[in-house]
UniProtKB/Swiss-Prot annotation:
Species, as recorded: Vibrio cholerae serotype O1 (strain ATCC 39315 / El Tor Inaba N16961)
Protein name: Large ribosomal subunit protein uL6
Gene: rplF
GO molecular function: rRNA binding; structural constituent of ribosome
One GO BP: cytoplasmic translation
Family under the similarity heading: Belongs to the universal ribosomal protein uL6 family.
Any single Gene Ontology cellular-component annotation: cytosolic large ribosomal subunit
Subunit structure: Part of the 50S ribosomal subunit.
PANTHER family: 60S/50S RIBOSOMAL PROTEIN L6/L9, LARGE RIBOSOMAL SUBUNIT PROTEIN UL6M
Described function: This protein binds to the 23S rRNA, and is important in its secondary structure. It is located near the subunit interface in the base of the L7/L12 stalk, and near the tRNA binding site of the peptidyltransferase center.
Chain coiled-coil ranges: none
Alphabetized UniProt keyword annotations: Ribonucleoprotein, Ribosomal protein, RNA-binding, rRNA-binding
InterPro entries: Ribosomal_uL6-like, Ribosomal_uL6-like_a/b-dom_sf, Ribosomal_uL6_a/b-dom, Ribosomal_uL6_bac-type, Ribosomal_uL6_CS
Amino acid sequence: MSRVAKAPVAIPAGVEVKLNGQEITIKGAKGELTRVFHNGVVIAQEDNQLTFGPREGVANAWAQAGTARALVKNMVVGVTEGFTKKLVLKGVGYRAAMKGNAVGLTLGFSHPVEHELPAGVKAECPSQTEIVLTGCDKQVVGQVAADIRSYRAPEPYKGKGIRYADENVRSKEAKKK
């Protein structure tokens, strides 16, 4: 039995929730998110709370209910506060700059790299070595950050590359002669 699914999700003021079968739409100040859930999950709205439970006779229904509850909680946080990921570029000549709806990156390749941003994700470059991504969908913001990081993941010897601001890159010792 999922302990996560047993806790209800509180709906703060200013957030609108629409339930349509297994589809849930949450609208808030930062945007609107829609998601369809597994049909083994029963979602009910009571006053300012959403409750989750399993449908009878469905295998792994408690696990699905716990997953649904966690996803809905992230949707509520996303439309009220939003999510932020910060990337830091480390290396000689590594730079980032905004180019319209894309992030332009100079990463030591023979060509500049441009990463197009999907709808719902905004980026800003407070300095040439920082990228701040914001959006209301946690999964999309995290995926864009991972895609940008994958162009030049931090290497373990000098630590050059793109890393998350809170990431700790373990460094290796150089080979001895």
